[in-house]
C-alpha cells in the first residue's frame, strides 16, 4: 500500500496555529507526528512518501502522480476559546470512514485526550 502523508503548513510560509504561551507551531508538531507515522507505516510494510508544503494543488498532484492509495493530511486546530479541547479525525469519502475511526480510536487511546469524534466533509482536498 502506498501512503502519502502531508504534515500541514510549511515553516517558512505559514506555520499554522501558534501557541501564544509557549510559541509551539503547528507546522513543527505535525512534521514530527508525520515522521513518526511514516516510520510506523514503513515498518508495517507500506510505501510512504511525506511532503510538507502549503501549496495543496502541488501536494495533491504529487500524491496522485505517485499513485498513492491513501492520502493523510495532519493538522492541529486552534481557537481563541479556552474550552475547546480534544481530538477529531476528518475524512472525505465513505471509503475513508473506516480508517478515520481507527485513527481516532488509536489517538484517543494513546494520548487520553477528549474524543471530539470522527467527522465527514466533502470540502476536504
Please give the residue ranges for each predicted region.
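Active-site-proximal helix/loop segments of hydrolytic enzymes
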Residues: 24-125
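Short glycine-rich His-centered loop
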Residues: 1-23
Amino acid at each position: 500500500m502506498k501512503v502519502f502523508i502531508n504534515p500541514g503548513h510549511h515553516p517558512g510560509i505559514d506555520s499554522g496555529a501558534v501557541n501564544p504561551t509557549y510559541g509551539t507551531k503547528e507546522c513543527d508538531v505535525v512534521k514530527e507526528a508525520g515522521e513518526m507515522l511514516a516510520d510506523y507505516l514503513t515498518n508495517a510494510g507500506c510505501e510512504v512518501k511525506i511532503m510538507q508544503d502549503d501549496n495543496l494543488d502541488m501536494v495533491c498532484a504529487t500524491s496522485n502522480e505517485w499513485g498513492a492509495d491513501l492520502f493523510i493530511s495532519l493538522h492541529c486546530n486552534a481557537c481563541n476559546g479556552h474550552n475547546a479541547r480534544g481530538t477529531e479525525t476528518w475524512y472525505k469519502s465513505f471509503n475513508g470512514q473506516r480508517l478515520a475511526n481507527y485513527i481516532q480510536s488509536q489517538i484517543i487511546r494513546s494520548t487520553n485526550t477528549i474524543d471530539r469524534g470522527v467527522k465527514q466533509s466533502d470540502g476536504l482536498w
